[in-house]
UniProtKB/Swiss-Prot annotation:
Summary of subunit composition and partner proteins: Homodimer.
Annotated EC: 5.3.1.9
Active-site residues (renumbered): 360, 391, 516
Protein name: Glucose-6-phosphate isomerase, cytosolic 1
This protein's encoding gene: PGIC1
Enzyme class of the recorded protein, top EC level: isomerase
GO cellular component, one term: cytosol
Family affiliation: Belongs to the GPI family.
Species annotation: Clarkia arcuata (Glandular clarkia)
Keywords: Cytoplasm, Gluconeogenesis, Glycolysis, Isomerase
């Protein structure tokens, strides 16, 4: 008998659907009263502690989710990814970001070739180059040390490295290594982003890293040309070779741009942009800022989770458990969003990065075979560090829509503060909220409790909390390069698990193409209208009206302008 074309046609899926009604009638207050259940929903790996007992799930639910994983051939799909099979079928590519952090003596193959030696050739090149820049043996055109770096990229070439950079900034070892240096990221084509990035920097001491696999990404290359002009106007065109390097595979275009191809750092088609932070995309700028040794620990942390993900049983496998629970929340309980709530300011850029990893990967409406999905998949990811989020959007989470939450806590702060006479130290104050919020969401507060507190009758409806709002808690022992790598890999693999179960391709992103192609048409129109005075044609009434309004209001923009750079 042939396997069902869609996971929703399997008996395991139907069994979970039938099971759903009983769970909906069971409040988390009741589920949390079962100590044995709670204990079974706690998993530890390498001092990372996961507690998923506050999920709207019984032990029976979890067992049924394991059966769903089996029906989806989850283990086989994970193995196929690690074996280099072309699981990105629409682009006919392997998906091997795990190879980017594999030890030097590993063997991971794509199309019959072990790619790990190539990975380490690039890593060795990054180490050598970053060491030379940091110790002053590679200097700028005027003989000054290059102490400031601007990394130019967009999407996965920016969000992942920015997350890791922000997380490392306050780590004692990393911050010591970065003393006197600055790393900035230029992503948006908005000239304001250029202005902010070059503000306060001296071209003589600035190195620009241009990140574009093809060296044709429109936004990135316009920003790169802008920074090239910033350097050339101050130091002369020949300075570009000393002040700009590339992360790209298109060496002819790199050379044409004015960058010596020797100073181009490769990555490969089997690395998707949103999974590329462990490639030269992230490793080069991060090594320039913090030194290769710190970044290598980050890679080792990610690799430890890669091993855990590929070898641990589902019952003990943190990414698998998180992925299955997300499928349960989205496709069965019908919750469309997820809040990522790290109780560490160092993780303030985690949610924006995972937003891309998750939503670009799993924001699909058809199966890997092109069949429309008859169920909800993908989730809307957002988040903010605690306790900031508590004073922002937690109101909705507590008394509005049900939004499953990821609470992430760190046992030891990167920067502890103790004040004499305070009841608790600053980190304990933060963590008090980390421990309290999941229970507040799970248990809520009943009208009966409010009456016992003598709350006015007319206020009781406003102060009632329904509870029964699911969350998971992840407790990390510390937050250094190694643990940051682990956290990244947990979320990467969680997203893959969801896609594998839903039967979609989590590794393409055709959704970004349509808007880009329409922007090309608009770009041509703006050029024709500004340079030749041609009327706006070929657009619907609404777009035509907006374009005409924009062109009229910017009629003072010269048709053939002289170069003008931001002045800030």
């Amino acid at each position: 008998m042939a396997s069902p074309a869609l996971i929703s046609e399997t008996e395991a899926w139907k069994d979970l659907k039938a099971h759903l009604e009983g769970i909906k009638r069971t409040h988390l207050r009741e589920l949390m009263g079962d100590t044995e259940r709670c204990q079974s929903m706690m998993v530890e790996f390498d001092n990372i502690f996961l507690d998923y007992s506050r999920q709207q799930a019984s032990s029976d639910t979890i067992n049924k989710l394991y059966k769903l994983a089996d029906a989806a051939h989850l283990k086989q799909k994970i193995d196929r990814m690690y074996n280099g099979d072309h699981i990105n079928s629409t682009e006919n590519r392997s998906v091997l970001h795990v190879a980017l952090r594999a030890p030097r003596n590993s063997a991971i193959c794509s199309d019959g070739k072990n790619v790990v030696p190539d990975v380490w050739n690039v890593l060795d090149k990054i180490k050598d180059f970053s060491d030379r820049v940091r110790n002053g043996s590679w200097i700028g055109a005027t003989g000054k040390k290059l102490k400031d770096v601007i990394a130019v990229g967009i999407g996965g070439s920016f969000l992942g490295p920015l997350f890791v950079h922000t997380a490392l900034q306050t780590d004692p070892e990393a911050s010591k290594n970065a003393r006197g240096r600055e790393l900035r990221f230029l992503a948006n084509v908005d000239p304001i982003d250029v202005a902010r990035n070059i503000s306060g920097l001296n071209p003589e001491s600035t190195l620009v890293v241009v990140v574009s696999k093809t060296f044709t990404t429109a936004e990135t290359m316009l920003n790169a040309r802008t920074l090239r002009e910033w350097i050339s106007s101050a130091l002369g065109p020949s300075a570009v070779a000393k002040h700009m390097v590339a992360v790209s595979t298109n060496l002819p275009l790199v050379e044409k741009f004015g960058i010596d191809p020797i100073n181009a750092f490769a990555f490969w088609d089997w690395v998707g942009g949103r999974y590329s932070v462990c490639s030269a995309v992230g490793v080069l700028p991060l090594s320039l800022q913090y030194g290769f040794a710190v970044v290598e620990k980050f890679l080792q942390g990610a690799h430890s989770i890669d091993q855990h993900f590929s070898s641990a049983s589902f019952e003990k496998n943190i990414p698998v458990l998180l992925g299955l629970l997300s499928v349960w929340n989205v496709s069965f309980l019908g919750y469309p969003a997820r809040a990522i709530l790290p109780y560490s300011q160092a993780l303030e850029k985690l949610a924006p990065h995972i937003q891309q990893v998750s939503m670009e990967s799993n924001g699909k409406g058809v199966s890997i075979d092109g069949l429309p999905l008859p169920f909800e998949s993908g989730e809307i990811d957002f988040g903010e560090p605690g306790t900031n989020g508590q004073h922002s959007f937690y109101q909705l989470i507590h008394q509005g829509r049900v939004i499953p939450c990821d609470f992430i806590g760190v046992v030891k702060s990167q920067q502890p503060v103790y004040l004499k006479g305070e009841v608790v130290n600053n980190h304990d104050e933060l963590m008090s909220n980390f421990f309290a919020q999941p229970d507040a969401l799970a248990y809520g507060k009943t009208p009966e409790q409010l009456k016992k507190e003598n709350v006015s009758e007319h206020l009781i409806p406003h102060k009632t909390f329904t509870g029964n709002r699911p969350s998971i808690s992840i407790l990390l022992p510390t937050l250094d390069g190694y643990r940051i790598g682990q956290l990244l890999a947990i979320y990467e693999h969680r997203v893959a698990v969801q896609g594998f179960v839903w039967g979609i391709n989590s590794f393409d992103q055709w959704g970004v193409e349509l808007g880009k192609s329409l922007a090309t048409q608009v770009r041509k129109q703006l050029h024709a209208s500004r340079v030749k005075g041609e009327p706006v044609e070929g657009f619907n009434f609404s777009t035509k009206t907006l374009l005409e309004r924009y062109l009229e209001a910017t009629s003072d923009v010269p048709a053939d302008p002289s170069t003008l750079l931001p002045n800030i």
